[in-house]
Amino acid sequence: MLEVGNAYEIEFSFTQEQVNDFCKISGDFNPLHWDEAYAATTPFKKPIIHGALIASVFSRVMGMEFPGEGSVYLKQVSEFKRPLFVGITYKAKFEIVSTNPAKHTAEISTQVFDLERGKLMVDGIASAMHTALF
């Protein structure tokens, strides 16, 4: 059984090729994500990673690692505090903040940090159900 306070961390990064693939999969071809010349005219100065692609890390972890296989990812609320860029290693942190054993659910803090700068990039909360673990 997983309990309040149990935590998990994973490091990740994305390549421009992965971002371009996500453009195709999602249909979001906003030049802010792939066009260096366009992005240079924005406050970000270079292409940024789609928020939904960043959130895919949460989906991967929730479904495969923590809580893992058999879990149902019910909800995600995320605040994107700073832009994320390709080629930078980030750390995603997960921590169980509450459980409801009667419903086999948990609320899990989901955060992304820039390892180099130590800054919080994404702050969120997720809900998951797992009949064997909560």
Predicted regions and their residues:
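Generic detection of short hydrophobic beta-strand segments and adjacent strand-loop junctions
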Residues: 10-14, 78, 126-128
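Mid-chain, well-packed structural core segment of small domains
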Residues: 64-92
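Residue-identity detector for glutamine
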Residues: 16-18, 76, 111
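HotDog/MaoC-like acyl-thioester-processing domains
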Residues: 1-7, 84-134
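Hot-dog-fold acyl-thioester-processing enzymes
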Residues: 1-71
